[in-house]
Amino acid sequence: MLKEYLTEEKYEELKESNDMIYKALELSLELFKSDTDKGGFPYVLHLFYVYKNVLEKEEKVVALLHDVMEDKNVTKEDLLEIGFPSKIVSDVLVLTRRKDVSYDAYIDNIIKTGSKEALEVKLADLKNNIDLTR
């Protein structure tokens, strides 16, 4: 549940904001502020890398959010309630790998959706994930 991670004031601020990049950035910073990657670096650096390596605004929003459902207790309903458009939430959902789905099936599903945004974010994500220092 998203409200577990945010103060009521911050939740309302994000809910009222129409700036999707600001909203995604603030939310990601709150959710991952104390997490580190396997290399010991702040996890948000991974999200920033993915953000930096996509071009379109919608892709950038999805890049910042691509791990919130998989790694945190955040639902699609949470993202919709705080004001993210259904297309962005749909792309985040597509990029969320369920534990009962094989990696090959997960990648096939991303391709089959035909979402250019989800595919671009996944490619940027993979590019950063092959960096052995993180």
Regions found by a protein language model. Give the residues of each.
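Active-site helical microenvironments for divalent-metal-assisted chemistry
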Residues: 1-134
